Design a protein with these regions (language model features):
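Short glycine-rich hinge loops at helix-strand junctions in the catalytic core
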Residues: 26
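Local sequence-structure signature of Cys/Sec-based thiol-disulfide redox active-site neighborhoods
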Residues: 1-21, 29-32
Length: 116
């Protein structure tokens, strides 16, 4: 994962703002449309490691799929949560900017500046 990536949802205003910030800084990165392209569990685990957070911390709790899959169940394993995030990428908080050994969740969007 040497190339910089932005996990991007074009329908999300925060994600669009983060994209603009990175473009204005002339950053070289790949836009990964994670809702359209398959997100592998191994890639998601690397992102979690770079963020230094547990899978549960990356969940969007307001999504219908969160409630439908009982993700508020504290007994769900990290492995199961990662599996559900790959199956239902809408569950993943966004945007996420990944560069070198670091990653940040772009909330607020200016947080992407922390790792450039």
């Amino acid at each position: 994962m040497d190339k910089a990536f932005l996990l991007h949802n074009p329908r999300c205003s925060k994600s669009r703002q983060a994209l603009e910030i990175l473009k204005n800084k002339n950053e070289d990165f790949i836009v990964f449309l994670y809702l359209e392209e398959k997100l592998e569990a191994s890639f998601l685990k690397k992102i979690l490691s770079k963020l230094s957070i547990e899978p549960r911390q990356l969940l969007r709790k307001g999504e219908a799929v969160y409630k439908e899959n009982n993700l508020n169940d504290e007994n769900l394993s990290d492995k199961k949560i990662v599996e559900l995030m790959t199956r239902f990428p809408k569950l993943i908080e966004r945007p996420i900017f990944i560069k070198n050994k670091k990653a940040v969740i772009g909330r607020p969007p200016e947080k992407v500046l922390e790792i450039i």
